[in-house]
C-alpha cells in the first residue's frame, strides 16, 4: 500500500471542499452557519473544513449536537463534539430528545419498524428549531458522497421521487421556518473522510449506532461497499450518472403549512414529530406508563 503524505492529502481534501462551497455558493459573506455536530467523522470534518474556510470568507459558525438518548452509545459522540468545538473555538449548543421531546430514543423505538424513523424526525426537528432560534442562515450537515448515493437509491427503491429534489449540495428555502441545508462533503467519499481523521489524529466517535443495522440504508450501504471492492469506481460512476440526469433545482411542489399543534412547517395538518408524539403517548397510556 502506497504511503499517504498527510500534507498533500489535507490539501487535496480541503481544496475539494472549498471548491464545492465556492462553485455552488453554499456560504455567503456574514452568514451564520450552524454545523450539525454528532461527533462522528463526517460532522467533525465538516466543522474543521468550515473553520478553515473562514480564512477565505467572512462568516460565523456555531455547532449543534443532539443527544438522541441511546444508552452506552451517544455519550462518546457528545464528548468528541465538545472536544472538537473547544479546540476550534466554536460555540457548541447541546440539545437532547429527553429535554426537547420528553423521552429518549431508547424509550420509544420499539413502537416502530425501525428506530431510524423517529430518530430522523426528531433529530431534524430539533436541529432546525435550534438553528432557527439562534438566527442561523444555513445548517451544514456531514452528508458525504456515499450518504448521497445511498439516500438516492433508498428513495428510488421506495418510489419516493419527491425526495429526488433533495439530491445535491444544497437545499434552498422552502418555508420561512425551515433553515436551508448545505452539504460541504457532498462529493467527498466516506473512505477519504475516515483517512483524514486517522492521518490527523482527530478525536471522533467511532462506534456504529446499535440500531443502524436494521435500516434499509445499512443494507444499501453494504451492497455498494461490497460491489465497490469488486468494481472499483462504481460509486463515482453512480454519482456522475446522477449529476447528468438530475438537476439540482429544489422543485418541491408541495405547499408547506404550519403544524396545528406546534407551528413547525409541514405538508400536512400535523407534522411528523407531533404524529409520533401522539402515537407514543397513546402507547404509553395503553401500558399505564409511569409519570
Predicted stretch roles:
Residues 244-255, 261-266:
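Short, flexible, mixed-charge glycine/proline-rich loop motifs
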Residues 92, 266, 278:
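Cys/His-rich microdomains that often coordinate metals
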Residues 2-165, 187-200, 271:
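ATP-dependent adenylation/nucleotidyltransferase module used to activate substrates
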Residues 32, 54, 285-291:
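Long, charge-rich boundary regions
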Residues 146-229, 234, 289-291:
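Catalytic subdomain that performs nucleotidyl-dependent activation
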Residues 116-129, 165-175, 228-244:
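Short, basic, helix/turn surface patches
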Residues 273-285:
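Short Cys/His-rich micro-motifs in 6-15 aa windows
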Residues 258-262, 271-274:
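Short cysteine-rich clusters marking metal-coordination/redox-active sites
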Amino acid at each position: 500500500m502506497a504511503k499517504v503524505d498527510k500534507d498533500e492529502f489535507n490539501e487535496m481534501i480541503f481544496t475539494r471542499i472549498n471548491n464545492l462551497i465556492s462553485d455552488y455558493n453554499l456560504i455567503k459573506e456574514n452568514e451564520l452557519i450552524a454545523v450539525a455536530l454528532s461527533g462522528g467523522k463526517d460532522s467533525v470534518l465538516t466543522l474543521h473544513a468550515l473553520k478553515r474556510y473562514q480564512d477565505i470568507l467572512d462568516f460565523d459558525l456555531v455547532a449543534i449536537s443532539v443527544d438522541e438518548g441511546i444508552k452506552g452509545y451517544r455519550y462518546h459522540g457528545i464528548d468528541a463534539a465538545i472536544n472538537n468545538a473547544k479546540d476550534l473555538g466554536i460555540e457548541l449548543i447541546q440539545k437532547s430528545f429527553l429535554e426537547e421531546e420528553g423521552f429518549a430514543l431508547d424509550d420509544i423505538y420499539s413502537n416502530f419498524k425501525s428506530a431510524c424513523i423517529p430518530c430522523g424526525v426528531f433529530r431534524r426537528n430539533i436541529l432546525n428549531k435550534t438553528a432557527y432560534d439562534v438566527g442561523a442562515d444555513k445548517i451544514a450537515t456531514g452528508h458525504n458522497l456515499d450518504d448521497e448515493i445511498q439516500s438516492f437509491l433508498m428513495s428510488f427503491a421506495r418510489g419516493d421521487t419527491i425526495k429526488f429534489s433533495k439530491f445535491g449540495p444544497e437545499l434552498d428555502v422552502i418555508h420561512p421556518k425551515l433553515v436551508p441545508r448545505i452539504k460541504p462533503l457532498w462529493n467527498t467519499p466516506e473512505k477519504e473522510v475516515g483517512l483524514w481523521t486517522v492521518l490527523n489524529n482527530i478525536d471522533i466517535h467511532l462506534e456504529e449506532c446499535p440500531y443502524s443495522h436494521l435500516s434499509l440504508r445499512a443494507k444499501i450501504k453494504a451492497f455498494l461497499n461490497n460491489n465497490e471492492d469488486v468494481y472499483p469506481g462504481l460509486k463515482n460512476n453512480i454519482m456522475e450518472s446522477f449529476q447528468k440526469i438530475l438537476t439540482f433545482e429544489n422543485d418541491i411542489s408541495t405547499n408547506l403549512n404550519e403544524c396545528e399543534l406546534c407551528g413547525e412547517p409541514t405538508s400536512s395538518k400535523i407534522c411528523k414529530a407531533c404524529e409520533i408524539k401522539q402515537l407514543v403517548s397513546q402507547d404509553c397510556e395503553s401500558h399505564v406508563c409511569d409519570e
